[in-house]
Amino acid sequence: MKHLVIAGILVLIVTTLLILGLEQVRLLPAQASVQAQTIDQLFSLEFKVIAFLFALIVVFMLYSIFVFRRKPGDTTDAAHIEGNTKLEIAWTLAPLATVMVFAVLGGQSLAETMRAEPRALEINVIGQQWAWRFEYPQYEVTSDTLWMPIDKQAILHLSSEDVIHSFWVPEFRVKQDALPGGEEFVRNIRVTPTILGDYKVRCAELCGTQHATMLAPVK
């Protein structure tokens, strides 16, 4: 029991240090949309759970290696352990429960990012090798810059004129493939910008030799 308590305390310490370290690293870019807030909350929870699981595995492994290693001159056989039914059930059910919880939370997060607001600005987003085009049917305007109002939801209708592209603005967090094939393959995403700034639309699907240059300004 003494070793279990010590290892448990070490797990908590390592978990705390990992979480604090991850918060300082700032793995994610600026949060610039309502949808980003929802997604970042899920990311934050996932990072905390991953930090705990990492600490749980590494601490027990290293503690066993250094504390229970064979002593010099000890030639006796180690205790033979064939199995532990309770432990096997626990390490099967715990990951299963974790996956199910994150599946539910992920579904809720997805539903929140797709929640429709009245009078959303409609924008047709067309990808082609290797550029983006943005059409505003309500105003009969076409632009190579994505103009979006602050604190107003926009619904983006994504399509492609040639191969599969993927619309991604890291600061908005949302990402969705733009597919060729006509209206039946149009995909929709909703974005509500919250911070005034200059961002970049990036293609997140390998689409040809100039894929890396497929950028468009967002204002």
Regions found by a protein language model. Name each.
Residues 3-25, 52-59:
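Alpha-helical transmembrane segments of integral membrane proteins, especially early/N-terminal helices
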Residues 19-45, 57-60, 65-219:
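Non-transmembrane, membrane-proximal soluble domains of secreted or membrane proteins
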Residues 1-12, 43-47, 88-93:
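Alpha-helical transmembrane segments and their helix-start/interface "positive-inside/aromatic belt" motifs
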